[in-house]
Amino acid sequence: MISALDSIPEPQNFAPSPDFKWLCEELFVKIHEVQINGTAGTGKSRSFKYYEIISNFVEMWRKTVGNNIYPALVLALPYRDRRIYNIKDYVLIRTICSYLKLPKNSATEQRLKDWKQRVGKGGNLSSLLVEEIAKRRAEPSSKAITIDNVNHYLDSLSGDRFASGRGFKSLVKSKPFLHCVENMSFVELKYFFDIVLKNRVIGGQEHKLLNCWHPDAQDYLSVISDLKVVTSKLYDPKVRLKDDDLSIKVGFAFAPQLAKKVNLSYEKICRTLHDDFLVEEKMDGERIQVHYMNYGESIKFFSRRGIDYTYLYGASLSSGTISQHLRFTDSVKECVLDGEMVTFDAKRRVILPFGLVKGSAKEALSFNSINNVDFHPLYMVFDLLYLNGTSLTPLPLHQRKQYLNSILSPLKNIVEIVRSSRCYGVESIKKSLEVAISLGSEGVVLKYYNSSYNVASRNNNWIKVKPEYLEEFGENLDLIVIGRDSGKKDSFMLGLLVLDEEEYKKHQGDSSEIVDHSSQEKHIQNSRRRVKKILSFCSIANGISQEEFKEIDRKTRGHWKRTSEVAPPASILEFGSKIPAEWIDPSESIVLEIKSRSLDNTETNMQKYATNCTLYGGYCKRIRYDKEWTDCYTLNDLYESRTVKSNPSYQAERSQLGLIRKKRKRVLISDSFHQNRKQLPISNIFAGLLFYVLSDYVTEDTGIRITRAELEKTIVEHGGKLIYNVILKRHSIGDVRLISCKTTTECKALIDRGYDILHPNWVLDCIAYKRLILIEPNYCFNVSQKMRAVAEKRVDCLGDSFENDISETKLSSLYKSQLSLPPMGELEIDSEVRRFPLFLFSNRIAYVPRRKISTEDDIIEMKIKLFGGKITDQQSLCNLIIIPYTDPILRKDCMNEVHEKIKEQIKASDTIPKIARVVAPEWVDHSINENCQVPEEDFPVVNY
């Protein structure tokens, strides 16, 4: 398919390449100065100033250089540059120390290694390295180095990275690197170091630079993922893109179509897919697209985010861990495949967890054959999107599948086509989910039989159905790092995105059904969402290895700011009572995938974070290099997420979320309360009384949260007056009513001073009865013995008021509370206490199926009990199943029994049921060793 853009000739510059120093001073330095010093005294906003600097630079380039900005753009956006240097912080530090002839482990080298602790605002490793160089030599006055020269040196650096390994010993001997170090000015050198480290040179302003160059540049880059192509086609702002320009092009990465997660009944899912769909197994791997060109002479592998992994999987049919095993019919000149790269364990014949994918490819690469390693990459193909010059995306799914099967010959356990079966109706979904669970799979993907392929979308045509596991908070969350606290083990504070006003309001509607049955094409996820701010949500330390800590440090180094020195901007970051020691701009940060057991809004934790709730049992699964920070989990995603699982200490999620947007003073309160309040006439019930409201109130029967502001407004509407300081005693104490249902710090202080505290129910019941009612025991939150004695005389032995009428509901409640002795409830353990080893498994009820009398079983059960868990002999009552045996026959027998009971559970339910995770016994020991419950899916039961 030929695009109109293909006929556009490549732009040519009419002037020679400008100096690299000019690029640094006219663009990099000016943007850096605005970041550090702001725009005080100019009367301009930072955003306006950035646009002014960038637009001036773009205009100068067009007038003095020409229409080809690629040489400068690839230096300004180094993380978009496809050149790979394999130069990390440590290597660069050792290289510069060796170049300066400093002794090994010298004081200077140690300072540089610990540069993060001493860097100031706006500083980074590159600036510190230049400082050390400047102390020992004068600034060179040699001939200027042009932008083209720099790109030539970077080409050489990238080309020789495999020559003798990329260590500091080889880098210090590299001629292009040494030439730059010895001949660049100090300003140039700083940005040269940033470029080879792949740091963000213009600090999050890349989109402004792209938009200033061409209004469609950013959109086109999201489809093409290649700066050179973007700049060669889009250099005239008057020439705009057409819709077909944003289609798939062989050789260029694109954003794939994604499956949508829904929380609907099987019946509604079927209706959404028109009762005609293909069922595929959901793979636990990395989304990879294969671009096959010129009969296999050139092959490229791209990730979902356009990262080029060709070096891992092979560049042609002649070599590579995957590419040499691609078998197409002779008629295939070029094509594009969509699929999942997983790791296959050749010995156990199972697919391994996601994190091993690239590691297996590297190991196979070093052995030159996947037959020589225990585990290796396996490419599972599920779609064909392009064939011999024609895009197949408009074709129906079943037709694309037919073409795929006709042109590709699978090779078992290396390149396979994902099996799919055409299904109709509810029972087929249940059956496919049963099979997925029995195989230990992630779940299934249901695809509308006649659906087209929509690039960069997530719509109703593809729906993923995953088993719902007890003691887990739905899907894993992709969260952005916004803060850091040091300790024996660093902990990172993570945040939720708040989208712009329009999208925020859109998500406040009825979310009971996420899928719109009336349209299959409307629900396309916008990959470029506008983020208004970020709210602190949780802190995570568990699950991050030392290597990952180092990698996070390397990626974010130089971008952290100490909170004590520079306050985080309230317009971007909002924290609760817990403020991190350091914070980071989200555009400079990194995304982590977090697994959690449930939400936690206990009294001790709800104030710590801006969301008024946090995660319980959070655990880092991995670093999401493929995720942009703007695509992370949002506040609205949290609203739409399912009810918190079985942990009894947590309430239903909607009441948990106390997600009060402080800026907008939103109130999470049901429409029914608003309607009831509006129906109440304005009265003088509270005339002459003064009220001091100390807390919100959550109604016992419905779980509706009535905020402090709502209570105050209601009191005023009915004649009461508000005061905000009781201690001053400017009013008659007999006229004052203190209202609270929580022992806040202020409330406790007033109790200690002898004040009586009434429950908010008294206010609401006064309004309901349309008069002041006497104080009775149920209205006494914390009062003196004298007042309580008087109150108790106003009710009978059941607590029924002698004066006020009682509703049927309240009478039933009183009867049950007085005449039945409830069994001892579960011990509610504060989330802080749960961190102690004694309570590690306090939320677990484990089932250990037995096939013989064995010490293995006894030891597992003993460990669960020792660390606060419980054991049950009924699978239906558990939230964790542990298969104890190493013997394959016994293990298989246990698993068959477990799966039969799970199948019965699925058949009996109209929606996706919540089931217990099944784990190998190693899960218990690993959890104890790490002092946290490690992810269950990392310990599947295999070899049965």
UniProtKB/Swiss-Prot annotation:
Record: residues binding Mg(2+) 1: E340
Keywords associated with the record: ATP-binding, Cell cycle, Cell division, DNA damage, DNA recombination, DNA repair, Ligase, Magnesium, Metal-binding, Nucleotide-binding, Nucleus, Repeat
Active site, UniProt feature: K282
Domain BRCT stretches: 681-780, 836-941
SMART domains: BRCT
One GO term describing the cellular component: nucleus
Major localisation: nucleus
Reaction catalysed by this enzyme: ATP + (deoxyribonucleotide)n-3'-hydroxyl + 5'-phospho-(deoxyribonucleotide)m = (deoxyribonucleotide)n+m + AMP + diphosphate
Transmembrane annotation, as ranges: none
Gene3D superfamilies: BRCT domain, DNA ligase, ATP-dependent, N-terminal domain, DNA ligase/mRNA capping enzyme, Nucleic acid-binding proteins
Disruption phenotype: Delayed meiosis I; sporulation results in an increased proportion of tetrads with only three viable spores. Very mildly sensitive to ultraviolet (UV) light and methyl methanesulfonate (MMS).
Alphabetized InterPro entries for the sequence: Adenylation_DNA_ligase_IV, BRCT_dom, BRCT_dom_sf, DNA_ligase_ATP-dep, DNA_ligase_ATP-dep_cent, DNA_ligase_ATP-dep_CS, DNA_ligase_ATP-dep_N, DNA_ligase_N_sf
GO molecular function, one term: ATP binding
Example GO BP: double-strand break repair via nonhomologous end joining
Residues reported to bind Mg(2+) 2: E442
Family to which this protein belongs: Belongs to the ATP-dependent DNA ligase family.
NCBIfam families referenced in this protein's UniProt entry, alphabetically: dnl1
Protein name, as recorded: DNA ligase 4
Lineage: Eukaryota, Fungi, Dikarya, Ascomycota, Saccharomycotina
